[in-house]
Amino acid sequence: MADSVMMGSGSLNSGSRSGSSKTCTSPTENYQLARRRTLQVVVSALLTECGFDSAEKAVVETLTEMMQSYITEVGRCAKANCEHTARSTPTLSDVVITLVEMGFNVDTLPVYAKRSQRMVITAPPITNAPVVPKSLTAGQKRTHPAHIPSHFPDFPDPHTYIRTPTFREPVSDYQVVREKAASQRRDVERALTRFMAKTGETQSLFKDDISAFPLIAAKPSPIPYLSALLPSELELQSLEETDSSEQDDQMDNDNNTSHIMQDDSGADKENEVLPPGGVVPSGKANEENMIDNPYLRPVKKPKVRRKK
C-alpha cells in the first residue's frame, strides 16, 4: 500500500518536480517553493485516497491553489478575530469561530481525522523563514518599559529617530555670488525683452517671417529734452525727505516757542516795555524774517509718512 501511494504521489508530482529543477538562490523563493511542494504532496495524497491513479499537472496546480487560498483565508480571519479581542496571537477558539463563519461543520472534523484510509505523509524538511537584512543600523534598540505590556509592538529602529537638515548654508564665495547675480540679471533682461516684444509693437528683420527675431519698436519722444529737465525718482525722494524733516523741525521750534511764551505771559503783562538790555523773543524775530511776498516763500509740501 505504501509503495502504491508513493508511486501515485510521485507520478502526480513529476510535473512539478521537473518544472522546479532549477535551483533558486534567494532564500525567500526557496521557502515559498518548499511550502508549495508540501501542499502538492497533500493534494496528491487526497487524490490517491479518492481512487485516482494519475492526474494532469494543471489539475494538481488548480487544487493546490484552492487549498492554499482556503488556508490563507482561515488564517486571515483568525487573525482578525484575535485582534478584535485585543490579542496578538490567535488561539484555537479563533480558528473554530472562523471555520463556523466560513460554513464548515466542525463536528465532522474528528471523524475525518480518524478515518481508516488515512495516508501518513512524511514531515517536510525544516526550512527557516527568510530573515530580512537590516541595511541601516544605528544605536541600540529600545526595549519596553515596565508599564508597557510585552505583546505590544516593538519600538522602531533607532535610525528612524535620526534627522538630517534639508537646508544648505548660503554661498559666500565672491566669484560664485557674482556669477549667480549676473545670470539672474541676464534672465530678467531676457524675460523683460520677450514680454515687451509680445505685448508691444515690434519690428521684424525679415519680411517673410514676422515672428522671427522680433525687435522692440523705438518710439521717438515728442519732446526729447523733457527727460533732462525733469528730476529723477531718487532726487524727488531725497527732496521729499529733506522737506519733511525741515517741516518737522520747524513745527518743533514753533511748539517750543509757544510753550515758552505761555509760561512767561504772567511776567510780560506786568512789564509791557522791555528793559534796555532785553532780548527780542524768537517768535517776533521769526515773524520779521518771514517774507511778505507769497510768490517768494518756499514751497510747503505735505508731510510724507515713512513706512516702518
Curated annotation (Swiss-Prot):
Concerning its family, UniProt says: Belongs to the TAF8 family.
Q: What InterPro entries does the record tag this protein with?
A: BTP (IPR006565), Histone-fold (IPR009072), TAF8 (IPR037818), TFIID_su8_C (IPR019473)
Q: What does this protein do?
A: The TFIID basal transcription factor complex plays a major role in the initiation of RNA polymerase II (Pol II)-dependent transcription. TFIID recognizes and binds promoters with or without a TATA box via its subunit tbp, a TATA-box-binding protein, and promotes assembly of the pre-initiation complex (PIC). The TFIID complex consists of tbp and TBP-associated factors (TAFs). Mediates both basal and activator-dependent transcription.
Q: Which cysteines are joined by disulfide bonds?
A: none
**Record has Zinc as a keyword:** no
Whether Transcription regulation counts among this entry's keywords is yes
Could you tell me which residues carry Phosphoserine?
Answer: S26
Q: Which Pfam families match?
A: Bromo_TP, TAF8_C
Q: Where is the composition biased (Acidic residues)?
A: 239-252
The entry's keywords: Cytoplasm, Developmental protein, Differentiation, Nucleus, Phosphoprotein, Transcription, Transcription regulation
Q: What is this protein called?
A: Transcription initiation factor TFIID subunit 8
> Where are the coiled-coil regions?
none
| PANTHER family given in the database record | TRANSCRIPTION INITIATION FACTOR TFIID SUBUNIT 8
Which residue stretches does the UniProt record annotate as biased composition, category Low complexity? 8-21
The biological processes this protein is annotated with in GO are:
cell differentiation; transcription initiation at RNA polymerase II promoter
**Gene Ontology MF: a single term:** protein heterodimerization activity
Instruction: Please provide, in alphabetical order, the Gene Ontology terms of the cellular component aspect for this entry.
Output: cytoplasm; transcription factor TFIID complex
Task: Kindly state the subunit structure of this protein.
Answer: Component of the TFIID basal transcription factor complex, composed of TATA-box-binding protein tbp, and a number of TBP-associated factors (TAFs).
Disordered: where is this region? 1-29, 239-308
Q: Which CDD domains match?
A: HFD_TAF8, TAF8
Q: Where in the cell is it found?
A: Nucleus; Cytoplasm
Q: Where is the composition biased (Basic residues)?
A: 298-308
| Motif window: Nuclear localization signal | 295-308
Q: Where is the Histone-fold domain?
A: 37-104
